[in-house]
């Protein structure tokens, strides 16, 4: 990456993008100038920085974790992971289940999902292990 002082001037940016209208070129110039300022700020010693990135990062983390309110004792990352896992499962269930707004399917067209052969064996093994554990208590 080029150091901030070697970055292109706003006029060079505007000339390099002839297909953009002037508003888009101005927006791009503003974003690039802001990016250059942030890079220059990161290049400066910590005590001379103009912006407080750590405070901003912590505030954004608090704001994003506030949307995942969970009083179960899990950490934010654990609860966020479970939310994503649940949302994927929920999405899959919603996709595979008929809704009131979907057209009614004929009973012959609906085929239930068959259980896998290993499903019952695993469950039986778990129950047997649980019975042995309880018997030893």
Swiss-Prot record:
Residues 65-82 have a biased composition (Low complexity). The keyword Nucleus applies. Keywords: Cell cycle, Cytoplasm, Cytoskeleton, Nucleus, Phosphoprotein. It is found in: Cytoplasm; Nucleus; Cytoplasm, Cytoskeleton, Microtubule organizing center, Centrosome. It holds the Pfam family RGCC. Modulates the activity of cell cycle-specific kinases. Enhances CDK1 activity. May contribute to the regulation of the cell cycle. May inhibit growth of glioma cells by promoting arrest of mitotic progression at the G2/M transition. Fibrogenic factor contributing to the pathogenesis of renal fibrosis through fibroblast activation. It comes from Mus musculus. GO terms for biological process: cellular response to hypoxia; complement activation; fibroblast activation; G1/S transition of mitotic cell cycle; negative regulation of angiogenesis; negative regulation of blood vessel endothelial cell migration; negative regulation of cell-cell adhesion mediated by cadherin; negative regulation of endothelial cell proliferation. The modification Phosphoserine is found at residues 67, 69, 71, 75, 91, 97. Interacts with CDK1 and PLK1. Interacts with SMAD3. Residues 57-116 are annotated as: Disordered. GO terms for cellular component: centrosome; cytoplasm; nucleolus; nucleoplasm; nucleus. GO terms for molecular function: protein kinase activator activity; protein kinase binding; R-SMAD binding. The keyword NAD does not apply. This is Regulator of cell cycle RGCC. Its main location: cytoplasm. InterPro entries: RGCC. The modification Phosphothreonine is found at residue 111.
